């Protein structure tokens, strides 16, 4: 009887499902305080997404000053500065993207144009939450 119990326990121990990592939803997103700063890699998106729904439910407009962030709350306003040039703009978070090592934000085509990111496609940025 003891041997059977041990076999059953051992058989069940290896069948645990792996946790699934998903981007935060609107209810568990982080509401950063004004002045919060983050640095990392930025990229941009637009063609292929224009007119589609964002994670917040808004229709994506590649010509609006918006961005996707992994876990900052929708509606958060962020000053984005391209460190290579010092160019900056303010965007509103309205979308999510999968967590990628080093990447902190995906900006719309309009924001990328203002920052000078269209050509290089990616660049190091400083994010600062603004009121």
List each language-model region with its residue ranges.
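Secreted/periplasmic proteins
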Residues: 2-131
